[in-house]
Amino acid sequence: MHARVVRNQIQPGKLDEWLALIQESIVPALKGQHGFQGFVAMIDREHDKSIGYSMWDSEADLAASEASGNYQQQIAKLGSVLAGSPARDVYEVTVVA
């Protein structure tokens, strides 16, 4: 299993809007992608930061999601609430408890 981790700096006062976009638009779009396993969102209200990570059956499924343009489309939906470009990393998931 592999995970894409995206760290965001959110504009002040926009965390709830970010969360609504995640729940109403981004997660449903992810659910339609082959190999998608789940999504977790975390927020730091004090510092206007968020982290979202999506889990995928394989590195190939994650890469296919990005190659299809899906990742870029979803990030574009967040443009009105982000304060800068998101930082993206990919990890192999080694322990799930």
Which residues does each predicted region cover?
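Short S/T/G/P-rich N-terminal loop/turn motif that feeds into the first structured element of a domain
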Residues: 1-53, 57-69, 80-97
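A common structural junction motif
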Residues: 72-74
